[in-house]
Amino acid sequence: MRVVLFAVLIASPLVAQEVAVPTASAADAPICTDRPTKSNFACTVPKGLFQIESDGLTWLTNNSGGTRSDQLLFTNPTFKYGLGDSSDIQINWVPFTRIRSRNAAGTVSTLSGIGDVTVRFKQRLTSPDGAFQLAILPFVKLPTARAGIGNGKLEGGVAVPINISVPGGWTVTLGPQLDVLADADGQGRHAGFTGLINIARQFGNFTLYNEIWTSQNFDPAGTVQQYSYDVSLAWLPRPTMQFDVGANVGLNRNTPDLVGYVGISTRF
């Protein structure tokens, strides 16, 4: 199994020197997040507002070659700030994770520590009122995790979130993403591709998501292909807060068998 944590880059736009003051309409709009599931959305945090999106707890399990691995992430927060009417900056960091492995002989090993830092910049390219939404999302991963949790390499890429609203409360999301990844031997870099299709249906304050996801890692030592089916449910008890729960089911041997999580997002 190969688990790759992607992180994100800031492309620094020109920002006015005065302090941003959110408008009443922006502050009253329902929260829009890049969770649950693996998809990103074209929406951005309103100018001058902060937003936090985080797993409360994530559990990952995988069986491969006679070895079972379980990983726990104790929160996985993303901090966002609205830079303008159509752009925001985002920082993601795993403050603590624990990996427990047991091989076929019954030997157990445990590894724990912090994760990598991901920095992202999102620029929405379309009007927020249209049925078609498009954004560009460059990112970079900063290697802050210890060996065994991260690969110790600077990596990055660019995602292009695409959202299409369909009558009846449906939303279709596409998520093409190009990645620049470190070679497994640490001697160079290569390309990767991530793609997904996500279909969501809103029921009042609840939204149900179904998603098919793939990652294609074109490492010179051998291409690593991952596929998963992801399902989740989000609930908005009020316009500035969201709770969610979800599961990702691996569809091939290179993908973790099961990932389960609960999360919360809030804006202020």
Which functions belong to the PLM regions below?
Residues 9-10, 135:
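Hydrophobic alpha-helical transmembrane segments of integral membrane proteins
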Residues 1-7:
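Sec-dependent signal peptide recognition
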Residues 17-268:
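Transmembrane beta-barrel domains of Gram-negative outer membranes and organellar outer membranes
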Residues 12-16:
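Sec/Tat signal peptide C-region and signal peptidase I cleavage site
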